[in-house]
Amino acid sequence: ALWKDVLKKIGTVALHAGKAALGAVADTISQ
């Protein structure tokens, strides 16, 4: 189930990227 590990890694990276993007948007709006 190597592809499961790959999907998990991609999902984790996407999640962190999404959180970072949301944080940047929130900072921009708050300013």
Swiss-Prot record:
This is Dermaseptin-TA1. Its main location: secreted. The lineage of its organism: Eukaryota, Metazoa, Chordata, Craniata, Vertebrata. GO terms for cellular component: extracellular region. InterPro entries: Dermaseptin_dom. Antimicrobial peptide, active against the Gram-positive bacterium S.aureus, and the Gram-negative bacteria E.coli and P.aeruginosa. Has hemolytic activity at 286 uM. GO terms for biological process: defense response to bacterium; killing of cells of another organism. Expressed by the skin glands. The modification Glutamine amide is found at residue 31. Pfam families: DD_K. It comes from the Eukaryota. Keywords: Amidation, Amphibian defense peptide, Antibiotic, Antimicrobial, Cytolysis, Hemolysis, Secreted. Signal peptide: none annotated. Belongs to the frog skin active peptide (FSAP) family. Dermaseptin subfamily. It is found in: Secreted. The keyword Secreted applies. Transmembrane segments: none annotated.
